[in-house]
Curated annotation (Swiss-Prot):
Pfam families: Iso_dh
Organism annotation: Dehalococcoides mccartyi (strain ATCC BAA-2266 / KCTC 15142 / 195) (Dehalococcoides ethenogenes (strain 195))
Lineage: Bacteria, Bacillati, Chloroflexota, Dehalococcoidia, Dehalococcoidales
Subunit structure, interactors included: Homodimer.
Protein family according to the UniProt entry: Belongs to the isocitrate and isopropylmalate dehydrogenases family. LeuB type 1 subfamily.
Enzyme class: oxidoreductase
Protein name from the UniProt record: 3-isopropylmalate dehydrogenase
Pathway linked to the protein: Amino-acid biosynthesis; L-leucine biosynthesis; L-leucine from 3-methyl-2-oxobutanoate: step 3/4
Length: 365
């Protein structure tokens, strides 16, 4: 099969981990006789340097003509000053909005060989395997009104409003129900309905949609309670659905269960994934650009590699190939190979390129 992909290496360690992801994808293409055409674009700090914006209209147009988009990392400390007119992260927000990517899917699975790598007791994290579904294009991050001002008396103020429409909530919640149906048929909806009106609407709509999924067990949990339970009993969860800001915070917390943010992939989809269908999406590791370790061959490429597996599953309809990448990662970890972020005594330490080569080697036989 033939596919056209837009590749956005981005900033910091982005180009390094992307190179390893494509190395593994090329191994899959060779084995299964697929063709992947890569077209490259700029995003983030490197795009600001060259074009003065974090995402150009040309790059966005290129993404829209692709079967899927691969992104590595966005962020550059040179642009951290909040007074600057443009920031690297603006490009990512514009990309999500421009491509209609409303559903962020983040699997959190702890490999048996990494149960001792997390800062949490092994007996707690062992067996953790759940999926976070985060609404991505609404809520406070896309606030309207959103402003900052100084009052006549000289007091500085700022406001960000959290707004959700019924349609925005319904489509992301249906993603949650569909994925729950393909797993253990258990869905946890996270909100703050004891305080926020937007959360009360969220909960009401979840209750209404649940009638269409009588085979799914639904639980409502407040965001603060969820934050505690993720650390105390992560194996309790299977599929979690929540709004934008809550999901942003909780998924970073959950990443520590796997021992490193370098282990966790993500997919941002423009539709509801269903078996036998292809859904346009953006695929990226959940980690940042990590500029302090860039160009040192020490970054962990596994999150990028697993993101490519998600792309094969959701946007290419290639479940067998996706599962093979995931199995290859498990085999490499079980054999004791590790990058510095997950290294422990007894492991064989590998650099970024070497880790990618090991995984590609297993796929290539």
């Amino acid at each position: 099969m033939d596919f056209k992909l837009t590749v956005l290496p981005g900033d910091g360690i982005g180009p390094e981990v992307m190179a390893e992801g494509l190395k593994v994808l090329n191994a899959v293409a060779k084995k299964y006789k697929h063709s992947f055409e890569y077209q490259y674009g700029l995003i983030g700090g490197c795009c600001i340097d060259k074009e003065g914006v974090a995402l150009s209209p040309e790059t966005l147009a290129m993404c829209k003509k692709s079967d899927a988009v691969l992104l590595a990392a966005v962020g550059d400390p040179r642009f951290d000053d909040p007074k600057l007119p443009v920031h690297p992260e603006d490009g990512l927000l514009a990309l999500r909005r421009g491509l209609g990517l409303f559903a962020n899917i983040r699997p959190v699975k702890v490999a048996p060989s990494l149960v001792n790598s997390a800062p949490i007791k092994a007996e707690i994290v062992k067996g953790t395997d759940f999926i976070f579904i985060r609404e991505l294009t609404g809520g406070v991050y896309f606030a309207k009104p959103k402003k900052r001002w100084t009052t006549p008396s000289g007091i500085r103020k700022a406001t960000d409003s959290m707004t959700y429409s019924e349609k925005e909530i319904e489509r992301i919640v249906r993603v949650g129900f569909e994925l729950a149906r393909s797993r253990k048929k258990k869905l946890v909806s996270v909100d703050k309905a004891n305080v926020l009106l937007s959360s009360r609407l969220w909960r009401q709509i979840v209750i209404e949609i649940a009638k269409d999924y009588p085979d799914i067990t639904v639980e409502h949990i407040l965001v603060d309670a969820c934050a505690m339970k993720l650390i105390l009993a992560p194996t309790y969860f299977d599929v979690i659905v929540t709004e934008n800001m809550f999901g942003d915070i909780l998924t970073d917390e959950a990443s520590m269960l796997a021992g490193s943010m370098g282990m966790l992939p993500s997919a941002s989809l423009a539709g509801i994934p269903a078996k036998g269908t292809k859904t346009f999406g953006l695929y990226e590791p959940i980690h940042g650009s990590a500029p302090t370790i860039a160009k040192q061959n020490i970054a962990n490429p596994i999150a990028t590699i697993l993101s490519i597996a998600m792309m094969l599953r959701y946007s290419c309809g290639l479940e067998t190939e996706a599962a093979e990448i995931e199995a290859a990662v498990d085999k490499v970890l079980a054999a004791g190979y590790a990058t510095i972020d997950i290294f422990k005594e007894g492991n064989t330490k590998l650099g970024t390129a070497e880790m990618g080569s090991q995984i590609a080697k297993i796929i290539g036989g």
